[in-house]
Amino acid sequence: MKVINSIKYLLKKFKFFYFFVLIGFFSIILELFAYNFFNFLEINKNLSDLLALLIGIFFAFYLNFFYNFEIHKSKFKRALILFFIISCFSWVFQKLVSYYFVVDNISYEATRIITSGSFFIIGYLLHRKFSFRDFKKVGVAFYLDKSLNLMKVFKMIGNNLDFIHIDLVDNSFSKNKVKNDIAILKKIKSQWPEHVIQTHIMSKKPTKWIKEVIEFSDILYIHWEIKENLDVVRKMILSSGKKFGVAITLKTPPKKILKILRKSSNLLILSIDDPGFSGQRFNFKAFDYVEFFNNLNFRSKFRICVDGGVDKNIIKILNADDVVSNSAILGSNNPADEIAKFQATKYNG
């Protein structure tokens, strides 16, 4: 049973890679078929080579973009350009390798398959980092509470998550009496040094907190409803080399945040009724908010993150870039496996 569970976990964990290789294989087959077809039509050899390459590239990109990494359509143009550039550089490099390391009596088709296969892993790493960097990511949320047992949590989830989401809440925003301990954030950064840390400040006066947490944060979410000048706070965050995100609740009128959203790289939608408390149910009103923001004409400029009540059933129909969960992951029998399930879940909306 352990072996079967381990296999299932690996299949979920490396889903992107497996499908990337499979799609890559079929794209090469399609490219070679097109190459021979153009040769049959007696089209110039170099032109046949180029046309076949373009067919293979677009085929691989389309399947990876929509069916493997499942990235929002607003990111299509940027991803296509990067995919094309990386693929062309890879193709040129493979041509040079095949030219200088020619083996007699090996056909063009065999040479193309061997050289491209040799670069699959490198290609995957480059495309995942650049072309398809906007795939849906899964983060686990923690309160900066003194009661947090960080080592226990690390043993449960390891490095399997995509990012860390920190909730810092004070009594100006919520009745939840959290004893915030900034030292925990420093430990979190030390425990997950390679992971992006999102810090969500639930406070009407966030400036005092920003000064304490900004060193250990990569993205800072600030609520639209604060009693300070939000644009001044935004500039303060950006001047420190960090990303600014605007956070809203389901009581926030979505149209009223459009001005500040145009200046933001991230949007956080709290999909629960009473922010500041964990373990709540997902409020389906959040779907209307997600749909509204997904249809904006500047959608490609920001990422949408949804936090609150998200489980493996909700994530299937949630068209967001990032999802945050606490109870559904940490409360499961196998949190690391649950993260892998979240990451492998396809959008079926």
PLM features: what roles do these ranges have?
Residues 157, 166-167, 213, 267-268, ...:
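Conserved, mostly hydrophobic/aromatic
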Residues 152-157, 205-215, 252-262, 309-323:
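Catalytic cores of alpha/beta
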Residues 186-192, 233-241, 245, 287-298, ...:
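Surface-exposed amphipathic alpha-helices with a cationic face
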Residues 2-134:
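Interaction-mediating elements
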Residues 224-226, 271-278, 320-339:
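Glycine-rich phosphate-binding active-site loops on the catalytic face of alpha/beta enzymes
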Residues 139-145, 163-177, 192-212, 217-230, ...:
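Catalytic beta/alpha-barrel core
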Residues 177-186, 281-290:
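Charged helix-capping and loop-helix junction motifs
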Residues 136-155:
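N-terminal pre-domain/capping segments
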